[in-house]
A protein has these predicted regions:
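A short, structured surface patch at a secondary-structure boundary
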Residues: 86-91, 96-182, 188-194
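Bacterial N-terminal signal peptides that target proteins for export
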Residues: 1-9
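Structured C-terminal subdomain patch of bacterial secreted/periplasmic proteins
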Residues: 51, 220-248, 326-404
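Structural recognition of the beta-strand scaffold that forms the well-ordered cores
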Residues: 122-125, 142-147, 188-192, 212-215, ...
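Extracytoplasmic ligand-binding site segments that recognize negatively charged/polar headgroups
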Residues: 121, 128-139, 146-157, 197-200, ...
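Bacterial Sec-exported substrate-binding components of ABC uptake systems
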Residues: 2, 23-131, 242-269, 393-404
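Flexible, glycine-rich surface segments
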Residues: 259-341
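C-terminal motif of bacterial Sec signal peptides marking the signal peptidase cleavage site
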Residues: 17-21
Length: 404
């Protein structure tokens, strides 16, 4: 602890120099209140579909036993080894070796494998979409530090923990409170991919001896793939059984929704960026999958991100107009730059919206800022979309509201 504390001053000086322009320039962080994939920095894919069937990594001194059973998630694997060791492989990023309490790190471990020593506790949570998963399997008491103030949480247990003092604000992802984390013996920082905008900050956290885990759940193409990350976090805390039980319940909810007959009505899901561009989801993202399950068709049928594997794509207004002007429904993603509550507010962002079919027909909806944190209840948004597509009872909706 003394060694870690002594390094804080030097690290904070480095941070000050970087912020003052004396270091390398980081990419823009976007809206710090959300860890949306819309502004994620990404790596090019280097793995193909065969990765899902690859053999478990061989680790000197460890004996492989089994692999976690996954149904929808494709962005990670968890391998189990004898004596309680586990290896988490996040395909877009790194591998993380979970070392059980009382055991030691294997000798000659590859330098690029991040070691997480159990018990996993005093966690810093900046990946806001993951907090609801911790709450769902009973692991929220292991989260001691938050990347949001109490007012920023829509997960009730997290908000209550902040207000009671059980959980403490320790700086947002880009401006960490290093001293608070060190004094509180932070054992793990769980970050969204927004941390990739500030690589120097991640390095400084790691230099303090705090392992950093980056959550890529937003890269999943199926809505339940994102929820299935609860199994990964269950493995971190040795709560696999509780995580499996919750996931099976959510999977059952989604399976029941698959009987919806498709209406063939088209839906565009988007938000307007601060630079005036339109940000939409690529076609194989989990949001278009939800629209399909709900009984609709995503307006952008074959949209890909040409530059990276990020789930969102920036379009010019002209590009968006060409496809979405005739869409039956527009859904404005209010989790990013705040809710747009009325048609007039939408048209103020760009007057061309007045020409859209959905605007003329009064079929424009928006999501609340709480949606991104609700990773544990994806079925509710699908139900909302189905009610929207079938002119159902709006009072039964959880996340969608109609623009007036």
């Amino acid at each position: 602890m003394k060694i870690r504390r002594c390094r804080i001053t030097a690290l904070m000086l480095s941070a000050a120099l970087l912020l003052g322009g004396c270091g390398s320039t980081a990419a823009s962080g976007g809206n710090s209140g959300n860890d949306s994939a819309g502004t994620d920095v990404t790596k090019d894919k280097t793995k193909d579909a065969a990765d899902k069937t690859k053999k478990a990594p061989e680790i000197e001194g460890l004996t492989y036993e089994s692999t976690m059973d996954l149904t929808y998630a494709t962005e990670f694997d968890v391998y189990y080894y004898k004596d309680g060791y586990k290896l988490i492989d996040v395909h877009e990023d790194k591998q993380y070796l979970i070392v059980p309490e009382g055991e030691e790190e294997p000798e000659n471990l590859a330098d690029d494998i991040v070691v997480i020593q159990q018990p996993t506790e005093n966690i810093y949570m900046a990946a806001t979409a993951s907090m609801s998963l911790f709450d769902a399997f009973g692991g929220i008491d292991k989260v001691k530090f938050s990347g949001l103030e109490a007012s920023g949480w829509y997960v009730e247990c997290a908000k209550e923990a902040m207000e009671s003092g059980a959980m403490t604000f320790a700086g947002k992802y880009s401006e960490p409170d290093y001293e608070t984390r060190v004094d509180g013996d932070c054992g793990l920082a769980i970050e969204s991919t927004m941390i990739l905008h500030t690589p120097k900050v991640q390095e400084m956290i790691e230099d303090l001896g705090i392992p950093v885990f980056v959550d890529y759940s937003s890269y999943e193409s199926h809505p339940l793939g994102r929820t299935e990350w609860i199994k990964l976090y269950g493995a971190l805390l040795n709560k696999e059984e509780e995580a499996d039980t919750f996931f099976d319940q959510q999977a059952h909810v989604i399976e029941e929704l698959k009987g919806f007959e498709n209406t063939e009505k088209t839906v565009a899901y988007f938000y307007v960026s601060t630079d005036g561009s339109i940000v939409v989801r690529k076609s194989d993202d989990y949001i278009p999958s939800m629209i399909e399950i709900a009984g609709g068709r995503y307006a952008f049928k074959d949209l890909k991100n040409p530059d990276s594997n990020a789930p969102s794509v920036k379009l010019t207004m002209e590009e968006f107009y060409a496809t979405a002007v005739d869409a039956d429904y527009l859904i404005y993603n209010g989790t990013i730059d705040g809710q747009v509550n009325s048609i007039s507010e939408l048209e103020a962002k760009n007057e061309l919206f007045s020409e859209f079919k959905a605007v003329k027909d009064g079929n424009v909806w928006y999501t609340g800022k709480n949606l991104y944190q609700a990773t544990d209840t994806v079925g509710e948004l699908i139900k909302d979309m189905h009610l929207m597509l079938t002119d159902g009872d709006e009072s039964q909706m959880t996340f969608l509201e109609k623009m007036e």
